[in-house]
Regions:
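Low-complexity, Lys/Gly-biased intrinsically disordered segments
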Residues: 1-43, 53-60
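Non-catalytic DNA-recognition/assembly elements of restriction-modification systems
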Residues: 1-18, 144-187
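A generic structural signal for short beta-strands and their flanking turns/coil linkers
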Residues: 28, 47, 93-95
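A short beta-sheet element
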Residues: 33-34, 53-116, 120
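Flexible, active-site-proximal loop/turn residues at the rims of small-molecule/cofactor binding pockets
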Residues: 38, 77, 151
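A short glycine-rich beta-alpha junction/loop motif
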Residues: 90-97, 109, 129-159
């Protein structure tokens, strides 16, 4: 394990979205909001807002989310992180930012687990700015937040193990839903 380095050393970039909300659209690319990023590190796209095709270029001027990017909430609801999946087309919503991992230096899955860790949470908490209405992570300081990460090959091995456990947990959750439904139908 190397000594702490700024998180920016592991990234190709750190970006936030526009500080506004687009006009409502019933279809088009996803406007990724806080509610779409779950506490357990997943994207929930069951209920999404959309941005129109005409407005999309304006909302992706700073960055277009790519598969493997790690999105996170930095204002109001904090400590939510998720990986952008293959096939996602959308833009960052208000109070959402992303880290584009450098695959030579960091495994995207390991980075997600690191961001969800208690030690990262405590470190972020020490930098949170408490506002009159909401708390926020100062994005201008985020790139310099310290991170002590192992070599990328070790990260991959750890992420493989943790991902396997996450898959088992998710599979068990689905089974529980099916069993509960079967029990309801029987009784």
């Amino acid at each position: 394990l190397a000594g702490p380095r700024p998180i920016k050393d592991y990234c190709l970039g750190i970006f936030d979205g526009p500080h506004a909300t687009p006009k409502e659209s019933h279809d088009g690319p996803v406007f990724l909001g806080i509610k779409n990023i779950t506490e357990d590190g997943r994207l929930d796209l069951s209920e999404v807002r959309h941005v129109s095709e005409e407005e999309y270029p304006r909302w992706t001027r700073r960055v277009i989310p790519q598969p493997g990017d790690v999105v996170f909430t930095y204002e109001a609801t904090l400590h939510r992180y998720a990986i952008i999946p293959e096939g996602f087309r959308g833009c960052l919503g208000r109070r959402v930012a992303l880290v584009r991992p450098n695959p030579v230096r960091v495994d995207k899955r390991y980075l997600l687990y690191f961001f969800l860790s208690r030690s990262w949470r405590h470190m972020v908490e020490s930098s949170v700015i408490t506002g009159a209405t909401v708390d926020r992570i100062p994005l201008e300081k985020f790139p310099s937040f310290p991170a002590a990460l192992p070599q990328v090959d070790i990260q991959r091995r750890i992420a493989d193990i943790l991902s396997a456990y996450d898959d088992l947990i998710e599979n068990n959750k689905r089974r529980m839903v099916l069993l509960e439904e079967a029990a309801r139908q029987l009784y």
